[in-house]
Regions:
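N-terminal pre-ligand scaffold of iron-sulfur
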Residues: 1-34, 38-60, 83-85
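Short cysteine clusters
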Residues: 25-27, 36, 61-63, 72, ...
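Short Fe-S-cluster ligation motifs
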Residues: 52-75
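Short flanking/linker segments adjacent to small metal-binding domains or redox-active Cys/His motifs
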Residues: 70-89
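Conserved, well-structured core domains of diverse proteins
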Residues: 88-182, 186-205, 209-210, 217-218, ...
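Hydrophobic residues within beta-strands of alpha/beta enzymes
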Residues: 211-212, 251, 343, 411
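Mobile "lid/hinge" segments at catalytic clefts and subdomain interfaces of large enzymes
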Residues: 247, 252-254, 259-282, 417, ...
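Glycine-rich phosphate/ribose-binding loops and adjacent secondary-structure elements
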Residues: 291-442
Length: 442
């Protein structure tokens, strides 16, 4: 881990609103001091999220030596102008040695922070983060090698036609046909900007494939830009109206995602404005709360009742279930009993706009073994008619090919799709300060 850079030897006064969430730059490299702009990538010095306790001016540290982050505690008095621009390890104070994370004891700083502040500075779920578990701590797709044809199995000539079409829900009255076995996964309007959602929908349409709404409701301009639109219904049922089902080509229930399952979600009232509020069916400036599970729905029969109603309204579009990879076989059995035409399985490595790190870093089976288990279970049940979609940490064509070889019928893409429209993987989607503007609403 790098040491922070001394940005200045004096604090800066900023005006804060009570309850406002900001992210203080801890690395000293941001060009938007004292707040984060994503420049911490690769330093190991993630920004510090905090909520303003009161409205008014606050003096925030710019020397990055404070023992009371993000606020100035006078530590800059021991620095000189010659220190500006240089890395400097926080020195703590004369009474105690400051804790420093090491490979042997990587959690020591975190434990000290909890001991000093409890959850006051990080919220009741603890530290938050965005995107998925970093790829370098996951099983590697690069460790899987392809077995190619030569004699025992004859290769095809380059002029031979090869089918790439994917049929979602072949048993449905109106199966959804995609030109390629890839589509854009669920990412909500509100987590992504309107411009990003429309760009992704337009690109998917040009490629002959689809895009998912995400749990935040259907953005009309996004749906109009794509003729293969998947509608996701999650526990909060944001923006759901039966009449919309005649405009979509597939529908699925969201049980969970690889980075966050069983905990619900919260979009603060200050972010529920304008079109975001309208699409979600909420009054402006009210908290958008997603409960941990669907209220009033418990059994497969409960979900099948809604599924059959959607089929009736839509003329028979495919109905699916999005599952995080936890109780894989049992949850697949539940989905099948509820009449699933397709299953989207999100493994460990799957991303999110914001999740408690205690969830993101500690739940879900990694995508590679999760896929193998799901394929084996469906084959054992002789349910090859149910389309199996895998997602969670896949990035490149080689990853997609290997997933198909392992038994996926298709792949849903999130991070790679965002990166294709400009995401620089700053991993700060939850701050509303996305340097590429993709996960920013202002």
């Amino acid at each position: 881990m790098s040491d922070p850079i001394v940005f200045d030897v004096k604090p800066i006064g900023v005006n804060l609103e009570q309850g406002e969430e900001r992210h203080w730059c801890r690395c000293g490299r941001s060009g938007n001091q004292p707040f984060c702009d994503g420049s911490h990538r690769g330093t190991g010095l993630a920004p510090l999220g905090f909520e303003a306790k009161e409205t008014g001016e606050a003096w925030l540290c710019q020397c990055k030596q404070t023992r009371n982050p993000p606020y100035c505690d006078g530590s800059h008095k021991d620095l000189s102008e010659q220190d500006v621009g240089n890395e400097k390890a926080p020195s703590g104070n004369s009474d105690a040695v400051a804790p420093r994370a090491t490979p042997e004891e990587p959690t020591v700083e975190y434990i000290h922070q909890l001991a000093e502040n409890g959850l006051e500075k990080v919220g009741h779920h603890g530290p938050m983060g965005s995107m998925g578990v970093p790829r370098n701590v996951l099983p590697e797709w690069d460790d899987i090698q392809l077995l190619v044809a030569q004699f025992a199995r004859k290769p095809l000539m380059e002029t031979e036609p090869v089918a790439t079409e994917l049929v979602i829900g072949p048993n449905a009255k109106r199966p959804l046909k995609l030109a390629i076995p890839l589509f854009v996964s669920d990412m909500s309007f509100g987590a992504l900007s309107e411009e990003a959602k429309i760009a992704l929908a337009t690109g998917a349409e040009r490629a002959g494939t689809g895009i998912c709404s995400g749990e935040g409701g259907m953005l009309p301009e996004e749906q109009q830009a794509n003729s293969r639109y998947f509608y996701e219904l999650a526990s909060a049922r944001f923006g759901y109206r039966e009449e919309l089902m005649g405009q979509v080509q597939a529908f699925h229930f969201k049980g969970g995602q690889g980075a966050k399952t069983g905990t619900g979600g919260h979009l603060p009232a200050k972010k529920v404005t304008g079109k975001i509020a309208s699409v979600r069916g909420l009054a402006e400036h009210t908290d958008a709360i997603s409960p941990p599970t669907f209220e009033g729905l418990s059994t497969p029969a409960d979900f099948k009742e809604i599924a059959d109603r959607v089929r009736e309204i839509s003329g028979g579009i495919p109905i699916g279930f999005k599952l995080s990879a936890n109780h894989i076989e049992a949850d697949i059995d539940f989905a099948l009993a509820a009449s699933a035409d397709y299953i989207i399985l999100d493994g460990r490595g799957g991303g999110t706009g914001a999740a408690p790190l205690i969830f993101r870093d500690n739940i879900s089976v990694p995508t590679i073994p999760a896929l193998a288990r799901a394929r084996r279970h469906l084959d054992r049940l002789e349910r090859g008619d149910v389309t199996l979609i895998i997602t969670g940490g896949l990035r490149t064509p080689a990853d997609f090919i290997k997933a198909l070889c392992l038994g996926a019928d298709g792949v849903a893409l999130s991070n790679s799709a965002m990166q294709a429209i400009g995401c620089v993987a700053a991993r700060m989607c939850n701050t509303n300060n996305c340097p590429a503007g993709i996960a920013t609403q202002d």
